Curated annotation (Swiss-Prot):
Main localization category: Golgi
Stretches that traverse the bilayer: 32-52
UniProt-listed InterPro entries: Exostosin, Exostosin_GT47
Enzyme Commission code(s) on record: 2.4.1.-
Expressed in which tissues: Expressed in hydathodes.
Residues linked to a glycan: N87, N253, N277, N418, N421, N557
Any GO BP annotation: protein glycosylation
Positions in the Lumenal compartment: 53-561
Entry protein name: Probable xyloglucan galactosyltransferase GT20
Length: 561
């Protein structure tokens, strides 16, 4: 009897277990797919919403090169992403000693080599905070999309500032080249020097041959003294090529290189087709060929071009052809998304576009050349409160130049140099004007940036800026975060709507304000805005080339592990 009772109890327990298991597995079978489907649909919904609100924005650049505003929608194609490119992500960046001690205090608090995950989050958070604080500082967004665009521009700017390098602290000590090898490709001549051979026919009716003398500096201007040349605004490519060939850390073995320099003169390549009726295939051909040539190199394939640098001596928009037939598509090619591009004007939503100073007429060789010039312009008596060298843009109703010219010529404290009659082709005319003025008006011209900004700065003339895209959102490595140290900002919109008189605003600046700005420009900024010649030997100063390559090496060290 005992045995039968135990057996009956055991069977009851077994039946209960089977029943519970059956219920459990039926729950899994019928409920989990529904839950999975619910969360998947929720994820898709959130992703779609985020994509609309964050990844797409619409910005327009006005230029006389285009009949209509030149507009870009970020997020619409691979070249216009707000989210960082494959090789650089805000959340994925490691902070620490990459932050310049000279500039961004907001990034300085992140400890070096400690809690790397926390550092990534901290850097990302700090950049997000800065973007939120500053996105409407200069331009008041008129739509949500424009607000996102401005935030993105600020984020990329501060990420670029995080690559600032103070250089060797003791410039008198021998430079260490450990981990700083620079390799210069020996490209077939069709990609560089051959483009200069037809210098009398690059632009129809214009002979550029004199500008290619002296390694791209142009002919010497003897009446201005030592180190002054008639340098063309688009001469950056041969100037930097000549200089990098004599870089103190140049290596001749690819395996020893940290940075690879590609001397393709893309600016001259695209310039020769600007005013000729040729097909888009012709405009794009040489750029595609240089990428095919590079793709045959293991050094290019190893890091997908992330450690490669191109110098393009024109504005970024000349290499981003979209609907308008102007220019090439070189910077829109997928292979060009990873390399670093040095340009005189960058695309503010491309983190690997780096803007560096326009070439000026001054190319010192020694510290003494710089010091002598600093002393001269600091002691210069300036008879004009303000000046403007330029021409009107009557075919562009959005340009403020006509209003500025009108305000200038109606004041006895403003001097206007009309560039439409070729007065500005003589460098001495422009430099004399700037050295004789306290403030120099710098409105946008064919594009947002102006070579004249740098001509005025090296002349000790305080630039007056009307849009942040002229300087503040451009030259992260060469101009400081605080624009008030070296410039005056007046809203372009205020001028356009004639709510302000620029001359009257500048009259209100105190003697101390002007003295402090001029001193900062001449003593602190000037050496880093000029390109020394290929034999330059600087011990006290770093010129624009030195700053650029110090920062490039830091960027690449952070991007390529």
């Amino acid at each position: 009897m005992v045995s039968k009772r135990k057996s009956r109890t055991s069977k009851t327990i077994e039946d209960s277990c089977i029943h519970l298991c059956s219920v459990f597995f039926r729950f899994l079978y019928y409920t989990l797919p529904a839950l999975f489907l619910f969360f998947f649909l929720l994820y898709l919904c959130l992703s779609f919403t985020t994509g609309i609100s964050y990844n797409n924005f619409h910005m327009c650049i006005f230029s006389r090169k285009f009949n209509d505003p030149y507009c870009n929608t970020a997020g619409s194609k691979p070249g216009f992403q707000i989210i960082s490119e494959e090789n650089v992500t805000f959340a994925g960046e490691i902070a620490g000693d990459r932050v310049s001690k000279d500039h961004n205090k907001i990034l300085n608090s992140v400890p070096v080599q400690e809690h790397k995950t926390k550092n990534k989050v901290d850097l990302n958070s700090l950049i997000e905070l800065k973007a939120e604080e500053e996105y409407s500082k200069y331009i008041k967004p008129t739509s949500e999309d424009e607000g996102y665009a401005l935030r993105a521009a600020i984020k990329y700017l501060y990420l670029q500032r995080s690559w600032l390098s103070p250089g060797d602290e003791n410039l008198n000590k021998p430079r260490s080249c450990e981990g700083k090898g620079v390799y210069v490709y020996d490209l077939p001549s069709k990609f560089n020097s051959d483009l200069l051979v037809g210098c009398n026919d690059i632009l129809p009716g214009v002979n550029l041959c004199s500008y290619f003398k002296n390694e791209g500096f142009g002919e010497a201007i003897k009446n201005l003294g030592k180190g002054w040349f008639a340098t063309h605004m688009y001469s950056l490519e041969p100037i930097l090529h000549s200089r990098v060939l004599k870089h103190p850390c140049r290596v001749y073995n690819e395996t020893q290189a940290k940075l690879f320099f590609v001397p393709y003169y893309g600016g001259y390549d695209v310039l020769r087709w600007h005013y000729r009726n040729v097909s888009e295939d012709v405009k794009d051909r040489l750029g595609i060929e240089v990428l095919k040539w590079l793709n045959s190199k293991e050094s290019w394939r190893r890091n997908a071009g992330k450690d490669h640098v191109f110098v393009l001596g024109k504005i970024t928009w000349d290499f981003r052809r979209d609907k308008d037939p102007w220019g090439s598509r070189f910077l829109e090619l997928q292979e060009m998304q990873n390399p670093t591009k040095l340009l005189i004007e960058r695309q503010p939503w491309q983190v690997n576009d780096i803007a560096i100073p326009h070439p000026t007429y001054f190319h010192p060789r020694t510290d003494d050349d710089i010091t002598r010039w600093q002393i001269k312009i600091m002691s210069k008596l300036r008879r004009n409160l303000v000046s403007f060298a330029g021409g009107a843009r009557p075919d562009n109703p959005n340009n403020i130049r006509s209003t500025l010219i009108e305000q200038c010529i109606s004041s006895n404290q403003c001097r206007f140099l009309n560039c439409t009659n070729e007065s500005c082709t003589n460098p001495k005319n422009v430099l004399d004007l700037f050295q004789d003025s306290e403030f120099c008006l710098q409105p946008p011209g064919d594009s947002a940036t102006r070579r004249s900004v740098f001509d005025s700065l090296i002349s000790g003339c305080i630039p007056v800026i009307f849009t942040p895209y002229t300087a503040y959102y451009q030259y992260a490595w060469h101009l400081p975060e605080d624009h008030r140290k070296y410039s005056v900002y007046i809203s372009e919109q205020d001028v356009k709507e004639k709510r302000v008189n620029v001359v009257e605003i500048l009259k209100a600046k105190t003697l101390k304000e002007k003295k402090d700005m001029k001193s900062y420009i001449v003593q602190q900024l000037l050496p880093g805005l000029v390109y020394g010649d290929s034999n330059a030997k600087f011990e006290k100063f770093r010129d624009a080339f030195d700053i650029t390559f110090d920062c490039l090496l830091k960027k690449i060290n952070r991007s390529v592990v």
